[in-house]
Regions:
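Non-catalytic, C-terminal membrane-associated alpha-helical segments of glycosyltransferases
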Residues: 60, 66-67, 74-129
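Conserved nucleotide-sugar donor-binding catalytic segment
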Residues: 1-83
Length: 129
């Protein structure tokens, strides 16, 4: 049981290296942005959606309360974090249109953020049983 807290603010640069937005909790104003279609890339569509939005507004507003519970299933599309590395790389290569070298450097930043920075936002909660 963990509580994932959001950063106090979420600029594009921070989202570039890590998807901090839980897609089941993220909302955007359709009247302002219009309908944004998700990418045809099978995985990481949610990350690309929020990157598209933050390209327009630069910083997202964070709601500091928990809005949902997320259940991790063993065989879900995103269960294997190692398998997702190639999909994250595809975000840099295809979505951002970066060359191989720059995308590789971005993956180093991504891994640093995932392994060092993002765990700071995860808090263990005590069971109420």
């Amino acid at each position: 049981n963990k509580r994932i807290e959001a950063p106090n603010n979420l600029p594009f640069r921070k989202l570039f290296f890590c998807n901090y937005v839980g897609n089941l909790t993220g909302i955007y104003e359709v009247n302002y942005f219009g309908k944004i279609t998700i990418s045809s890339i099978r995985k990481r569509q949610d990350w690309m959606l929020w990157l598209t939005i933050l390209k327009k507004i630069k910083t997202a507003q964070v709601i500091p309360e928990s809005l949902a519970y997320y259940r991790i299933r063993e065989n879900s599309i995103s269960a294997s974090k190692f398998e997702l590395l190639k999909d994250n790389f595809a975000v840099y290569r295809i979505f951002h249109k970066l060359n191989l070298f720059v995308a590789s450097i971005c993956m180093i930043g991504f891994l640093f953020t995932q392994l060092i920075i993002k765990p700071r936002y995860s808090k263990t909660i005590k069971s109420s049983t």
